[in-house]
């Protein structure tokens, strides 16, 4: 077990973000795999499975990096982690807030907070 002082941040696995060539086509294909469409914008989509696991679909020219998304339960957790990582928090158009940082092997990790009224 890691010492608390060594902990960068923690969260539960929420989603992965992958590149896709054709957003509309890939949304349809993930629906055929049992995913539902949660969010659709011109530049990305979020699909969720029955347990709530998400796949963010990013067109090749997306400003978002491929990444692992970890969810925190409170804004205070997000703020504390962002301070430890020395990263700015960005509020998003869907009401969430997050920051990106480097994870294991240099892969991007997004730490994200969903407010209580998300999706309502």
Q: Residue locations for each model-derived region?
A:
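Core segments of cupin and vicinal oxygen chelate
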Residues: 8-11, 17-54
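Vicinal oxygen chelate
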Residues: 1-9, 12-21, 60-120
